[in-house]
């Protein structure tokens, strides 16, 4: 189930099409705390989607608008700038050491497939916050390579080609 909670921290998307998905983690284990932060105008931060550890999804910004998730200096590829204006941002509730739950990843894969299908995003353009701000960010990998990038790219490829892919979310332990 997905609920929509409008964030004031957004702008109208310019005529640039969506070509990236940027995946983050929240650096917190609190879904409700992240919701409060994203709807606080003083925070000046948001994402299009938040995926909780139980698989719950909240949407804060319509995909037609710009969420403020990647930072103004973010570039992908290097030299192109403007990541927020051409991307969809997804935050996963988690920290550098918490890893991700099976329920959370299952919801992420379904969400990611829909976004890729709607916007025709190439699998190599499903990236992490660490990719667009490498000198400042480590998410969603955290302290080690815990994010399953091969699965994310397989889900994106399957969504583009309308083929099935068998994915396993992981453990909810």
Predicted regions and their residues:
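Basic/polar, cationic surfaces and motifs that engage anionic cell-wall
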Residues: 85, 95-173
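Active-site-adjacent loop/helix surface patches within enzyme catalytic domains
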Residues: 1-121
